[in-house]
Design a protein with these regions (language model features):
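Short, contiguous, well-ordered secondary-structure segments
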Residues: 1-3, 22-24
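Bacterial N-terminal signal peptides that target proteins for export
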Residues: 3-14
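Bacterial N-terminal signal peptides
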Residues: 13-23
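Boundary at the C-terminal end of the N-terminal hydrophobic targeting segment
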Residues: 25-29
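Catalytic glycan-binding domains that act on GlcNAc-containing polysaccharides
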Residues: 30-175
């Protein structure tokens, strides 16, 4: 009887663990019709290879930045939960209309103030493929500018050491 209870506990624990892990894989739909988390991770890997970014680094950054949520929005340090693109666009436009420019947008959390001019519009910034491509080019340019991937990671988040120390640790652990 004890063995049966232990087996049931083990099976229950395994199911709970798998539910948690699989439920948090970041499998969000993207702008790529009928895409899913698998497409997203495959795309990130492809972008890493094309831009000569070490395997898994861009994926780690995206995971830390947004949890793989293509509609992630952060306004002046406050995370806004947007479940779809239209809600994210509306939230961002409202903030911009109020004069706010410190807005991190999309799956790789590209900052509107510093990088918004490199996109046609907010919708393009929220497009996961475009957002990831831009993040890769930004990360590569930071690597060239600062000489190491660890420094590039820090500066991807912020040039301010008080802001990037904890962030870079999270990314390195995820990497």
């Amino acid at each position: 009887m004890t063995k049966v209870l232990n087996i049931k506990k083990t099976i229950t624990g395994t199911i709970l663990l798998l539910s948690f892990v699989l439920g948090n894989t970041g499998a969000y739909a993207t702008d790529n019709t009928s895409s899913n988390g698998y497409w997203l991770k495959k795309h990130i890997t492809s972008v890493e290879q094309r831009n000569r970014i070490p395997r898994g680094l861009l994926s780690a950054i995206v995971g830390v930045e947004s949890g793989f949520n293509p509609y992630a929005v952060n306004i002046e340090g406050k995370t806004i939960t947007a479940n779809d693109k239209s809600k994210a666009v509306k939230t961002i436009k409202n903030a911009v209309n109020q004069g706010v420019t410190n807005i991190d947008i999309g799956i790789a959390q590209i900052n509107y103030r510093w990088h918004g001019d490199n996109f046609k519009n907010i919708e393009e910034m929220l497009n996961p493929a475009t957002n990831i491509e831009y993040a890769a080019k930004l990360l590569s340019s930071l690597f060239k500018q600062h000489g190491t991937w660890h420094k590039a990671i820090r500066h991807y988040h912020s040039a301010n050491p008080n802001h990037h120390k904890q962030y870079s640790r999270k990314v390195v652990i995820a990497w």
